[in-house]
Curated annotation (Swiss-Prot):
The keyword NAD does not apply. [7Fe-Mo-9S-C-homocitryl] cluster binds at C288, H455. SUPFAM superfamilies: Helical backbone' metal receptor (SSF53807). This is Nitrogenase molybdenum-iron protein alpha chain. Its cofactor is [8Fe-7S] cluster; [7Fe-Mo-9S-C-homocitryl] cluster. The keyword Iron applies. It catalyses: N2 + 8 reduced [2Fe-2S]-[ferredoxin] + 16 ATP + 16 H2O = H2 + 8 oxidized [2Fe-2S]-[ferredoxin] + 2 NH4(+) + 16 ADP + 16 phosphate + 6 H(+). GO terms for biological process: nitrogen fixation. This molybdenum-iron protein is part of the nitrogenase complex that catalyzes the key enzymatic reactions in nitrogen fixation. Keywords: ATP-binding, Iron, Iron-sulfur, Metal-binding, Molybdenum, Nitrogen fixation, Nucleotide-binding, Oxidoreductase. It comes from Leptolyngbya boryana (Plectonema boryanum). PANTHER family: NITROGENASE MOLYBDENUM-IRON PROTEIN ALPHA CHAIN (PTHR43457:SF1). The gene is nifD. CDD domains: Nitrogenase_MoFe_alpha (cd01976).
Amino acid sequence: MTPPESVTLEENAATAVDPKELIKDVLEAYPEKGRKKREKHLNVYQEGKPDCGVKSNIKSLPGSMTTRGCAYAGSKGVVWGPIKDMIHISHGPVGCGYYSWSGRRNYYIGTTGIDTFGTMQFTSDFQERDIVFGGDKKLAKLITELEELFPLNRGISIQSECPIGLIGDDIEAVAKKSAKEINKAVVPVRCEGFRGVSQSLGHHIANDAVRDWIFPRTDKAKKDGTIDVDPTQYDVAIIGDYNIGGDAWSSRILLEEIGLRVVAQWSGDGTINELINTPTVKLNLVHCYRSMNYISRHMEETYGIPWLEYNFFGPTQIAKSLREIAAKFDETIQAKAEEVIAKYQAQTDEVIAKFLPRLQGKTVALMVGGLRPRHVVPAFYDLGMRLIGTGYEFGHNDDYKRTTHYIEDGTLIYDDVSAFEFEEFIKEMKPDLVASGIKEKYVFQKMALPFRQMHSWDYSGPYHGYDGFAIFARDMDMALNSPTWSLIGAPWSK
């Protein structure tokens, strides 16, 4: 991807620091053993290289303030939680569920507590006696009670927390027995937080649970002729869009405008029937590659359904993705894609004309989760902004390979960056904007640095699609050009 031409990294005073020297300086604070481990996760991208040159998906250094989550967070908080018509039990002590309760803005349509349950919290509230004697009976009773209290639920998932795996409870046996009793899907998910090195394994475990406990229902429905969708040649599924602030809805609008039929959304505003119906589609459109590539690959291998990673951040990338998607179908869809791109051109030109003069040349440092350290970059470029640093909380090597298509030579790369490292990088690079998560938000705002939260859009959005780009541009302008910042001084400038 080509960044804006108006300002080069060398010309921008904010990036006068040599990033290679900066890495060395920051690592000096560590003991030798820790320094050797962390230096493998930090690098400066060299154009033409096949990847970003960092190690990833490795256990965090003990004692470092990592921003990562756990496997439970990846399964319950990301993949399963947004399935709106299922009840998701946080099986274990109350804290894990309580502190992750409704933390992501997964918008959905429905009546909460009647036929949808996305913002509700259900827990087995493990106590000491449950650790000693086991919690299988308690879990079975909980499922029975939930069925009585919320009869319109379409299924239940059991999101196991650390103690469940440590004491060896058999949640699979409970799930099988309970499913027969209530005649609905009961899905056990072995997502205990101690598994793996981050929330990324939780995504994988959640994907495997869909494969093992939901898709057999698909196969049976196909065999019995009871599947409740009449396939067409234009059927697609949106995979890995969690509808943060309505993002999936914005994406769906564009896909339907070019003539495609969206059969399923995974998993923002999604239902269990949509999961079951997905293996009937002609193409899976993957938004968050990191969290959903596993099930997409499985469907390709098992059902012959191809998949494509798309990006609807910023008009340049939207047009590119629409054309790539349309190329998988016939000339009718391809022609409609061009019509849709042309339809929104005037709107796009108006947004850029308004905000480009106010944002051009501004620098941004990113540090987010699954896909946004690369996917949001084109939207910044479309506004004339510059990326000087980016990194993933829980990225894998293939994420960093994909990132090379979005960044330019000299970009600072940081994997699983610690709180200390990130603060030191920002102090020296002095970007105009920091775009990261809620844990970082107030640290940098107290430094008088403009900040936008890239996990939940700072309670704004949607940011996907052409309409979302207008909101994105407005929000970046609000953050950078608010008069607030002229009234506050950074600690290092005193």
